[in-house]
Curated annotation (Swiss-Prot):
4-CDP-2-C-methyl-D-erythritol 2-phosphate binds at residues 8-10, 34-35, 56-58, 61-65, 100-106, 132-135, 139, 142. The gene is ispF. This is 2-C-methyl-D-erythritol 2,4-cyclodiphosphate synthase. The record marks 34, 133 as: Transition state stabilizer. Keywords: Isoprene biosynthesis, Lyase, Metal-binding.
C-alpha cells in the first residue's frame, strides 16, 4: 500500500462561476489559475501522483505549457490516473477536504463524489469529499481564496 498527500490553493479573482470537484458552482468571484482552477481535483491529482511516486501535477501538466491553458481538471485527473494504473496500482480510497469560507460546498459534494468516482473508475464508497471553513481566520477565512487537501491510498494490483 502507498499513501499520497496533495495540496492546492487558488486566489479569488475575476468573475465566477468556480469549478470545484468538477462541479460548476455559481459564485460572484472566479479563481485565478492557468487551468480551470479546480483546487479539489488538483489536490487529488497530486495525492494520487505522490502515492505512485510520479511527481506532481505541475511536473505532468506544467503551467508554462500553453496546451494546459484553461484545461479541464477532470481530463488531467483521468490522464494522471491512466499513468498510475500503467504502473500497476489500483485505488484503495481517496479523501478530499475543501477549505473555504464561501461559497457553501455542502450542496455540491454529492456530485463531486460522482464525478471523482467516474474519473477514477471506482465505487463512490471509495471517494470521500468534505468541506470546512477556517472560522474566518487566514486567507480562506478572509475570502481571499480556496484551499484543498487530499489523501489517496493506492494498492499494488495483483498480476
Amino acid at each position: 500500500m502507498r499513501i499520497g498527500h496533495g495540496f492546492d490553493v487558488h486566489a479569488f479573482g475575476g468573475e465566477g462561476p468556480i469549478i470545484i470537484g468538477g462541479v460548476r458552482i455559481p459564485y460572484e468571484k472566479g479563481l485565478l489559475a492557468h487551468s480551470d482552477g479546480d483546487v479539489a481535483l488538483h489536490a487529488l491529482t497530486d495525492a494520487l501522483l505522490g502515492a505512485a511516486a510520479l511527481g506532481d501535477i505541475g511536473k505532468l501538466f506544467p503551467d508554462t505549457d500553453p496546451t494546459f491553458k484553461g484545461a479541464d481538471s477532470r481530463e488531467l485527473l483521468r490522464e494522471a490516473w491512466r499513468r498510475i494504473q500503467a504502473k500497476g496500482y489500483a485505488l484503495g480510497n481517496v479523501d478530499v477536504t475543501i477549505i473555504a469560507q464561501a461559497p457553501r460546498m455542502l450542496p455540491h459534494i454529492p456530485q463531486m463524489r460522482v464525478f471523482i468516482a467516474e474519473d477514477l473508475g471506482c465505487h463512490m464508497d471509495d471517494v470521500n469529499v468534505k468541506a470546512t471553513t477556517t472560522e474566518k481566520l487566514g486567507f480562506t477565512g478572509r475570502g481571499e481564496g480556496i484551499a484543498c487537501e487530499a489523501v489517496a491510498l493506492l494498492i499494488k494490483a495483483t498480476k
